[in-house]
Amino acid sequence: MGSYIARRILLMIPTLLGILFVSFIVVQFAPGGPVERVIAQLSGADTGGTSRISGGGGDFGPRGQTAAGAAAGAASSKYRGAQGLDPDFIKSLEKQFGFDKPAPERFALMLWNFSRFDFGKSYFRDVSVLQLIKEKLPVSMSLGIWMTFLTYLISIPLGIRKAVKDGSKFDTWTSAVIIVGFAIPGFLFAILLIILFAGGSFLNIFPLRGLTSDGWSQFPWYWKIIDYFWHITLPLISMALGAFATMTLLTKNSFLDEIRKQYVMTARAKGCSERQVLYNHVFRNAMLIVIAGFPGAFIHAFFSGSLLIETIFSLDGLGLLGFESVLNRDYPVVFGTLFIFSLVGLVVNLISDLAYMWIDPRIDFEAREV
């Protein structure tokens, strides 16, 4: 077991290096950048994400010069909108954002800093990236935890019921419903919920933005809880929609596999009722794979739904932070959040594998390759 864990931990290093390297290469060719953003702000130009994507220049390569740009000097020719600006000012911006160094040197410096969990400071927020992540992480964590809890709370009883009623009309209709729900993208369902229940076109029952109301700190403790769940209802439903199908069908198939085994027939032959067979014999074995998959289900909820759902509902978590950082070309925040997401994902995947062994000792990781 120890050697397996050691191999998995060592494999995390090249995996993280590969993720950071590919992302760094993509950034080199991405249009726009922090220098262009500052130039656009000075000139009053549109700095929105759409304009930067549809527009030209990045921070990482020379571009063709106009006559005015040639007069301004070679330094300003790299950036769209820099024509006529003092080349020394452009160079000072490059130095401020670290673009005065060649790309390999910047990448090596980033790896060295990340190895010490030093993600630098945000370009435009004047605060360290680590502090930003600490501030935003609880929001994303709470969404992931409650979404996973809600999924297990509904899917496990439903999956057991479907296994008991396998082939019945109940099984057929519920399968159709959860498969349709699985096919609907979470962000599209979130927009539908807003239209129906958040003042879009019909009812105005739930709030549209944030996790708490104004003046939340002044509420009594019981009203704080009510207000929190009032705000989180629509985001949770939107995130959990796709996970319901996966967990329900996993539970159903796990129970069906156990029900067909010899020990179940023996229990029935000994006179045990169906309820005793199901909950005293089948339940413990069938739930092994479901319970062991809890870390994986949580990390899936943490990653897959947080970006779009947090953006749609204006929830101030890591997903929204990453989205805004990409639009603003705030590269320290982009790479810092990417590193944290990747590291957490790798660690939780390892924990998920170890959970299988802890729940089912028959699994022997020492006998298999990583």
Which role does the model predict for each range below?
Residues 26-29, 91, 177-210, 231, ...:
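Membrane-water interface segments at the C-terminal ends of transmembrane alpha-helices
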Residues 5, 9, 89, 93-119, ...:
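Hydrophobic alpha-helical segments of integral membrane proteins
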Residues 1-13, 269-270:
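N-terminal Sec/SRP start-transfer signal
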Residues 12, 136, 140, 176-179, ...:
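Residue-level signal for discrete positions within transmembrane alpha-helices
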